[in-house]
């Protein structure tokens, strides 16, 4: 299976000027039992994809912190390096610098970009709540992904404990983050590959509408992004598993992810 992701981006989205780079699909050939990369990469001089690791407080709709790991993280880092001039960090074996940390790890504060998967599965402890509060107000950024309508009743209270008094805003497509490099319009609703193969619907749960919620600090800096009714990371993880799914969702998912990463790096 071969397809030019950059070409898909240039056809489906407004992209930066200059020739698009032709790249091929990353196959899902990595060993999903690869040892977990704890801590930060050996060669940290560049962008690092950090994922928040946790032990489930409850069993929500999906399994936990490791959904789509490590393939989504690996693929996203490769594509970020290919589609932009961003330097990425690496492990000594040459792998892109995707890693995971807990809320209490010392390395947390060296992760300007932090992803959390399936946040409805977890309630932060008081110590972790204080830690995440400090992390976000000292320059950190948290992207909570793969959430669907029933999950919000768990996610919102956690965010309100971390950032008391904060307002969760439904970000409009006109927010500059969504066009900082690629013009992402409309904002994508991305199902998991499995759900899409069963139903050919973009929503995994009924007629759910996609939302991208933002939380801002007192200086109007975006500190939390919540992709609601969308599983963006599956479009990264599964890009090599199904041609139709790739063509329907990969360009949208990567365009959004790259925009978010660049926004974090420049704001």
Language model features with spans:
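Aromatic-Pro/Gly-enriched surface loop or interdomain linker
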Residues: 19-113, 119-120, 231-234, 238-267
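Bacterial N-terminal signal peptides
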Residues: 4-14
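Helical hinge/lid and interdomain linker segments adjacent to catalytic or ligand-binding clefts
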Residues: 69-157, 161-162, 190-199, 227
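An acidic, glycine-rich "communication" segment
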Residues: 22-33, 57-61, 151-239, 249, ...
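Sterically constrained small-residue positions within well-ordered secondary structures
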Residues: 10-11, 40, 216
